[in-house]
A protein has these predicted regions:
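N-terminal small/polar loop signature for handling phosphorylated ligands or for N-terminal nucleophile
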Residues: 1-48
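Structural motif
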Residues: 30-33, 53-55, 203
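A short, gly/pro- and small-residue-rich
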Residues: 44-61
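Short glycine-rich anion-binding loops that position phosphate/pyrophosphate groups of nucleotides
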Residues: 37-40, 60-62, 175-176, 210-211
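Short, glycine/charged-enriched secondary-structure capping and boundary segments
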Residues: 18-21, 46-50, 68-72, 120-121, ...
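Short alpha-helices
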Residues: 57-125
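Solvent-exposed alpha-helices and their adjacent loops that cap or buttress functional pockets
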Residues: 25-27, 47-49, 63-64, 94-96, ...
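Hydrophobic helix-and-loop "lid/oligomerization" segment in the mid-to-C-terminal part
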Residues: 1-14, 28-29, 108-226
Length: 227
């Protein structure tokens, strides 16, 4: 069988993996698996419905039910945790490279095991992946590394963060600010956890202005899950 990864590249993660270019003909008779995508509007490649069978694997609330088969588990920290559980339970042969990427997915979605979604099962499955042969230290060090311009943007966020008496915080990143720091919307994902390092902050939102004037909102919480 032939397996292709379809979708848009995330610029900050291309060091880890890049998407494949897929012709329309590849969808003929294909099994399409959509991961970590709660609603159809967020699916990168709109050809997802052109295959023979569609599976949804996700850990967000199942508000948009789609697919011929849907596996949604809101108790999981991530789609990576779910896939790891499936591989372990069914005793699939898991390559070292696959284990590395799944481990990175769990680390990323749990904020390095800091978020409330981290369970005992999450840690057991991460340990199972860690038993595979990949450079754990290099991977996690790379995931924790930021460019100088992102570091400067993080400083701006700390300087301009508004925090109320309930521990709710917000900061607005306008197009002007993005241009000043030479940062794209996608690159702001690297600083989404920054406000959470402040002891008086319980939940926070980062409002990123888009080129068309709309805002992308990144919401996070230390205690209560946000979906």
């Amino acid at each position: 069988k032939t397996i292709k990864a379809v979708g848009f590249d995330e610029p900050t993660l291309t060091w880890m993996a890049e998407m494949d270019l897929v012709e329309d003909s590849a969808y003929q008779g294909a099994l399409v698996i959509v991961c970590d995508t709660a609603n159809t509007a967020r699916i990168d490649d709109k050809r997802y419905s052109q295959g023979d069978f569609l599976i949804k694997i996700d850990h967000h609330p199942n508000d948009d039910v789609y697919g011929d088969l849907s596996w949604v588990d809101t108790s999981s920290s991530s789609a990576s945790e779910m896939i790891t559980l499936f591989a372990q339970t069914t005793q699939l042969a898991l390559s070292d490279r696959a284990a590395e990427l799944l481990f990175a997915g769990i680390v990323g979605d749990t904020g390095r095991f800091l978020y409330p979604s981290t369970t005992a099962r999450t840690l057991r499955l991460a340990a199972y992946l860690r038993e595979h042969n990949f450079d754990f230290a290099a991977l996690t060090r790379k995931m924790d590394t930021m460019s100088y311009k992102i570091a400067k943007l993080q400083g701006y966020i700390y300087d301009h963060l508004e925090v109320d008496e309930n521990g709710a915080a917000r900061v607005i990143l306008s197009q002007e600010i993005l241009k000043r720091f030479n940062v794209t919307d996608a690159e702001t994902a690297a600083i989404v956890g920054a406000p959470g390092r402040i002891d008086s902050v319980s939940l926070w939102g980062i409002f990123v202005e888009q080129a068309d004037g709309h805002y992308r909102v990144r919401l996070r919480s230390k205690i209560h899950p946000i979906n």
